[in-house]
Amino acid sequence: MKHSTRPSMLCMLTLLMLLPAVGCLAQQGPPPQVYPPGIRGGSEVEPEKGVEIRHYTFAPTGEQLPYSVFVSSKIRKGQKAPLIIALRGFTGTTLTFVRGTTVDLAEKGGYILVGAIGYNNRAGFGVQAVPRPASGTTPPPMPRVMPPLVGGTAEQDPATITAYSEQDVMNVLERVRKEFNIDDRRIYLVGHSQGGGGARHLAEKYPDIWAGVALLAPALFNVQVTAESNITRIPMLLAVGDKDTLIGSIRDFSAQLDGLKVEHEFIVKEGLDHGTIIMGAEPEVFRFFARHVKPVAR
């Protein structure tokens, strides 16, 4: 009995014709982020001109942990420079902030800009890595494909990793203060998402360090502030995009601060989402930092 090969050959030819298109789609990944006019994104993987990725030995585990540094060309020898410590969101990198518009504004304003990894890029800077959402709050969606783990891997205990995450930030701060002539009255802290929650924690725990703190789309689930909270002594900026599912919890946090008459600014950026707020809010962040110098005695 003779079998026709025409259908199978047609199927094979069709598959071969489709393969390039399938490969192209697979390589495209997520669509590019769309920023407002005048905002530049940049890479979270490859450092741009003027940005260094450095490493140091983290004593508790002996691992080499990364941090990123940008130094404005406006800084002169012997001149005290303002410093910004930047904390990435969940699965981000040390370049989450140290790129694009943030670098442009740091250059223009004469800042040193430093991105810490927080032991690794899934740890919470002293806060549990995956906070439990408050009632009625929707956390941002998890990425479909988890980005690679960056940073320390030797420690596996969640509580220890959380403590190491905080310790890494403070280690990096200490290293930078020793290397550069830092203006102690102009040390600022900024964080996004998980890093925003971490920035709130570090501001609360070390209030005498920071001249101001900026929380961009921060993970603030179940956070309560009282009149005795140390963070009430620090000028604070809250920024969120109107397309971000976290906007409700951040509004609630701002309302807590209003009730306590805490000095802070709350900005909702039109058209921005959980990711684009990072670069999209930087002009407001730098204007906010420029207005705040830590008092001699707080």
Where are these regions (language model features)?
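Bacterial N-terminal signal peptides that target proteins for export
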Residues: 2-12
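Bacterial N-terminal signal peptides
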Residues: 11-21
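A domain-start/cap signature at the N-terminus of enzymes
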Residues: 24-81, 142-146, 165, 194, ...
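Serine-hydrolase catalytic machinery in alpha/beta-hydrolase-like enzymes
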Residues: 53, 57-68, 78-181
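Alpha/beta-hydrolase fold active-site loops
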Residues: 82, 111, 211, 234-235
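Cell-envelope and extracellular/periplasmic
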Residues: 88-90, 177-180, 192, 199, ...
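The feature captures the conserved acid-bearing segment of alpha/beta-hydrolase catalytic domains
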Residues: 212-287
